Amino acid sequence: MNNEERLERQKNIRNFSIIAHIDHGKSTLADRILENTKSVETRDMQAQLLDSMDLERERGITIKLNAVKLKYEAKNGESYIFHLIDTPGHVDFSYEVSRSLAACEGAILVVDAAQGIEAQTLANVYLALDNDLELLPVVNKIDLPAAEPERVKQELEDVIGIDQDDVVLASAKSNIGIDEILEKIVETIPAPSGDPSAPLKALIFDSEYDPYRGVISSIRIVDGVVKAGDKIKMMASGKEFEVTEVGINTPKQLPVDELTVGDVGYITASIKNVDDSRVGDTITHADQPAEQPLKGYKKMNPMVYCGLFPIDNKKYNDLREALEKLQLNDASLEFEPETSQALGFGFRTGFLGMLHMEIIQERIEREFGIELIATAPSVIYECILKNGDKVIVDNPSKMPERDQIEEIYEPYVRATIMVPNDYVGAVMELCQRKRGQFINMDYLDDIRVNIIYDIPLSEVVFDFFDQIKSNTKGYASFDYELTGYKESNLVKMDILLNGDKVDALSFIVHKEFAYERGKALVERLKTLIPRQQFEVPVQAAVGQKIVARTNIKSMGKNVLSKCYGGDISRKRKLLEKQKAGKAKMKAVGNVEIPQDAFLAVLKMDED
């Protein structure tokens, strides 16, 4: 293909993604677009086609972004190439959304006709506007009995400033309005601007590892052309490779001769090391490099850390490999080795949030067959010591002693909660209980309120989302962003079993709640830890001070069962022997702790 043909083809390319709050019908709309452009054989069609992980199907959510090429014959008689980049909707995966948007010129904004605009809808709209994308608004699920499309159109105009005439009314499930959406994509979303004769610039927006072909990078070509056999260079790492294959996803991978401006496809170059093909990097030609790399997207830093330990200690190296492979597709996952007296060798692992943590744990157990014990998650605290040093604490067991600490700071988030009028009181009470500071409240219309609070991340991270949902019968929606650190009166609480500290059960708590948290936890552990041959005291301590204690009663073993009748001194001898044996056992006392006990630290708020 010469440059004129490439430029001609470029005019008919449209790159877009679909953004929406979780459950507003994004994956169903993607399915309908695939069907109506005849991109997928009817026999291959299945619900949530782009959600390729079993886990995504089971939970009905999108976790990984996915890119496909579609062909569309428009009503004006021209043939168009669409690249649809599917994105997740859950707040934990917002970095996946920002990666998808960096590869597009436009976005379809899907809003549920019954639910209206929700917190994450807004968060995603702001992301799209930051990337200068054209928005194509769609009100979905208009055939639901509870649908109020006119109210939602008005809301889109009032809250986001979208002209009501531009809104398409649709129902992805019933295939209503899909043809209009396809025509609107052609009309409203601009063609890619780029120069096929300029030096190559391609953005890596995703990558996966294949044991035979090495790293497969998903790329969007911004300038230039790339073919198999080209020598390429990664601009961030400076490493050079030879391209072995370029191709497109239809959703299956299909090799092609070349990728040019506006194309979204994949590239393989026998890259064996994960770090050499980092998401957000720019690919250029080794012999004629571009001067400036593309603006990547901001790296997402983990918000939550927890320890992952293999139940079978021999699988430590397998766990390292599993984490390395997952890290390739998931730039936000971080891990480093850690040892625990209670659990042996494992990794301190950083995640974006609790859903992200659950998904990674489930993937390790399913895809790599490694059974795990996870410790209670914690956030990152900053301690200023009396000697002026600053210490970052991502693991409660590393917290310096209280008498060395001058000040402790903890991360706060700005939480935006959209809630129906009737539940405002319940939500505000929950936020106060979670040490929240009230910032603002606006009425979006006569039924919905937007409440803004600053809340410590440690209070939000565990089950705040579930509690908001249960306090509002599932009607509230929630989004948050990190705002910075604030000074706080925090203490480290240790749990002692049989007089020994269990490092994996330590946690950091606000001083005001230390007593009740400690009391609730020891009571809970009493029910979770199986009874031993000897009595086991369970204590919660802050520094040297014990704030709560309970005992796990011993299992009585009847040593006299074999002693029929006979002399009392014989019975006494057996009982004395048992007593001595128990004392010895208690001295070496090794208490088996089940996995539930480590998670009990999280569940205290529910009591």
From Swiss-Prot:
Residues 11-193 form the tr-type G domain. GO terms for cellular component: plasma membrane. InterPro entries: EF-4 (IPR006297), EFG_II (IPR041095), EFG_III/V (IPR035647), EFG_V-like (IPR000640), EFTu-like_2 (IPR004161), G_TR_CS (IPR031157), LepA_C_sf (IPR038363), LepA_CTD (IPR013842). It is an enzyme of class 3 (hydrolase). Its main location: membrane. GTP binds at residues 23-28, 140-143. One of its GO terms (molecular function) is ribosome binding. This is Elongation factor 4. It comes from Staphylococcus carnosus (strain TM300). The gene is lepA.
